[in-house]
């Protein structure tokens, strides 16, 4: 029997969190035992759950009086459970729905030699596609949000393979990747013990790209497994294209690049950052300023 700890962060989005948990109760768990932790990450919407409704997934709700971000929230859950006996730690976004065999398939792939992390094929939730009007009705729910990921080192960006494409079998081969999204990421406990979980300086965005690079540098492989399927609402708690995006993506791209990019790209990032200080949007400028001031974590952002 293999044991999995599932870590879910809740932030002002009760409907999504409840739907996510309901999907977990339908998982095929033969040979698996799961324990699920929902961390209320400083939210104000009064998450109320009937724990007895989720006995199959052994649910525990934790309260965090402040919003510690994606990084701090998952780190808090891991700190809570690190002394327990378990094999795998699953990071799961609360605006996600797991297909019933998803977790079983992911864990089976962990038996492959050298694999330290596995991610599934992820679709946009039906009706939540970026450009839903351009698809046929029968294509909705089959549009990729993520079909594996990679780091574009020429631009220092973490990229989703296949995003906005309809699934026509073009990404049906499992493969090794160098960027695993934190939306649904299964990790071996031994990996976290060796490299730790998230660098809390990121707060949110680029934290999963940073974790991926540390996994690879520790000698482990990251596997994309297309037979495992998940649906994701996309930016359910942050909102795509927002000032929040401007701030954290700008600041954290600098942090990620200075940690992991080549010397040539580091020099390019410095030049680009100087330009952004004069031509960027308000929160892009603030993100650059805070990077140089080493103001990380939640930083200066205020909605």
Question: What would you call each of these model-derived segments?
Answer:
Residues 63-82:
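Glycine-rich, basic loop-to-helix element that forms the pyrophosphate-binding segment
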Residues 154-160, 166-187, 209:
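A recurrent flexible, glycine/aromatic-enriched loop bordering the glycosyltransferase active site
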Residues 97-143, 150-154:
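Conserved donor NDP-sugar-binding/catalytic core segment of glycosyltransferases
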Residues 23, 39-49, 66:
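A conserved acidic beta->alpha catalytic loop
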Residues 22-33:
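Short, acidic, metal-binding catalytic loop of nucleotide-sugar glycosyltransferases
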Residues 178-229:
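A short, conserved alpha-helix in the catalytic core of glycosyltransferases
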Residues 85-97:
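Short beta-strand-to-loop acidic/aromatic patch adjacent to the donor-nucleotide binding site
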Residues 244-254, 258-303:
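Non-catalytic, C-terminal membrane-associated alpha-helical segments of glycosyltransferases
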